[in-house]
């Protein structure tokens, strides 16, 4: 009797353990992402822990939960709790009296605005705005960089270098800087676009100042400058921290180099020259398999092999015929990279060699002058396969597809917003997207 009980207990325990392992492997135990706090999502890698999505999308379009009129801009959307935060540009037209007190003339006030909406209703919770004339800034629709939410604060950077740290509760200011006036900043041709990066208790930003003021690190709580490094001009790419041999370095892609600096003090570690036309170092570097990959437009892609020591790195391969990205962020999975090439569309290639396997012949998004699609990997609840993506293309179409080394296959497509280059946010079973006129919250169809 006692032995039988023990046997049953052991068997039950083994079954429970086995079920737990299966649950982890199949995704049943996965925690869904309720927040999208930074550029490219909770892990900063363009992956979304999502519910299992249905392939059957309504012909009349996906249901819009709410829509809110906003101003222009390319800034992505960030979400924490019930707060949806992004940036736009507001132009206030008016009149002012001339000195004689009788005549009037037209006036225009240009503002950059950080604003917060309620996730459930779209109602505005707060807004923080400041004067920011754009002058002759090209593509001057509005701010470019997605807000960075960290705990109870949100960090933003405007197109011409206004860096703000705000309280997420009410939008009141904690600290602020003007990168151009205060730190020798040189805005890129199309304005600052790299979001602030939080590393430990530092806020890392690209200023592009000479004399060692390209990369700046500020104290997260006080805004005090802690260190500064490099003298390159600023690009548009997000710095990436990586841990190697017990040491953290920041990989930075500037218009003239692929570099790494010490994440704690800014000390330069290694540098590979790579001059990009018009300074368009845009996409965030992909770092896997001891390789740092950047994908440029006119001069193509470069893969850097990271050495054993923090100061060592060498060019592994380069390719400038088939692998030429611009704004669209490439994604990586299991040894392969998926890049939106300017001519051939979504393209799959091997990270280790740069060997191209296929392209989708511009199926995901139209070719156009500046092809764009914001692509995320789906880690879907209850699915064992890991090769599904969601992409918001330049036409405002949301596309559900399967992509792997074997090819590209579309499952569903629905237009949810006007043409846009801005990155959306994915939370729960919703996608939030913005254009120059509105911000929408759309519910996605979840499989039974």
Positions of predicted regions on the chain:
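Noncatalytic, solvent-exposed loop/strand surfaces
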Residues: 27-448
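N-terminal secretory signal peptides that target proteins for export/translocation
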Residues: 1-7
């Amino acid at each position: 009797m006692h032995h039988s009980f023990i046997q049953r207990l052991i068997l039950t325990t083994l079954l429970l353990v086995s079920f737990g392992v299966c649950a982890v492997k199949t995704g049943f135990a996965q925690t869904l992402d309720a927040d999208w706090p930074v550029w490219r999502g909770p892990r900063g890698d363009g992956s979304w822990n999502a519910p299992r999505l249905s392939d059957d999308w309504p012909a009349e379009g996906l249901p819009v939960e709410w829509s809110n009129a906003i101003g222009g801009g390319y800034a992505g959307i960030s979400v924490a709790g019930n707060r949806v935060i992004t940036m736009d540009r507001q132009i206030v037209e008016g009149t002012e009296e001339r000195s004689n007190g009788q005549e009037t003339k037209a006036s225009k006030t240009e503002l950059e605005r950080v604003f917060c909406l309620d996730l459930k209703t779209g109602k505005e919770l707060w807004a923080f705005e400041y004067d920011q004339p754009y002058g002759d800034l090209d593509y001057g629709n509005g701010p470019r960089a997605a807000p960075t939410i960290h705990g109870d604060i949100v960090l933003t950077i405007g197109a011409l270098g206004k860096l703000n740290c705000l309280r997420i509760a009410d939008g009141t200011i904690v600290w602020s800087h003007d990168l151009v006036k205060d730190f020798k900043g040189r805005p890129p041709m199309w304005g600052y676009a790299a979001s602030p990066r939080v590393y430990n208790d530092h806020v890392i930003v690209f200023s592009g100042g000479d004399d060692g003021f390209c990369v700046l690190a500020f104290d997260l709580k006080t805004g005090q400058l802690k260190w500064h490094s490099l003298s390159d001009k600023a690009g548009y790419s997000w710095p990436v921290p990586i841990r190697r041999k017990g040491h953290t370095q920041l990989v930075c892609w500037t218009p003239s180099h692929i570099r790494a600096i010490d994440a704690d003090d800014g000390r330069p570690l290694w540098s590979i020259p790579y001059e990009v036309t018009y300074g368009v170092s845009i996409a965030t570097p992909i770092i896997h398999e001891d390789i740092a990959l950047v994908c440029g437009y006119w001069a193509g892609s470069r893969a850097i092999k990271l050495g054993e020591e923090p100061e060592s790195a060498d060019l592994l391969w380069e390719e400038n015929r088939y692998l030429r990205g611009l704004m669209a962020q490439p994604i990586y999975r299991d040894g392969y990279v998926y890049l939106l090439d300017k001519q051939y569309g979504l393209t799959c290639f091997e990270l280790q060699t740069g060997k191209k396997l296929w392209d989708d012949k511009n199926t995901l998004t139209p070719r156009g002058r500046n092809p764009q699609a914001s692509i995320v990997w789906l880690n879907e609840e209850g699915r064992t396969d890991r090769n599904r993506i969601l992409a918001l293309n330049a036409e405002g179409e949301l596309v559900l597809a399967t992509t792997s080394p074997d090819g590209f296959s579309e499952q569903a497509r629905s237009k949810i917003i006007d043409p846009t280059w801005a990155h959306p946010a994915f939370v729960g079973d919703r996608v939030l997207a913005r254009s120059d006129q509105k911000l929408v919250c759309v519910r996605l169809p979840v499989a039974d």
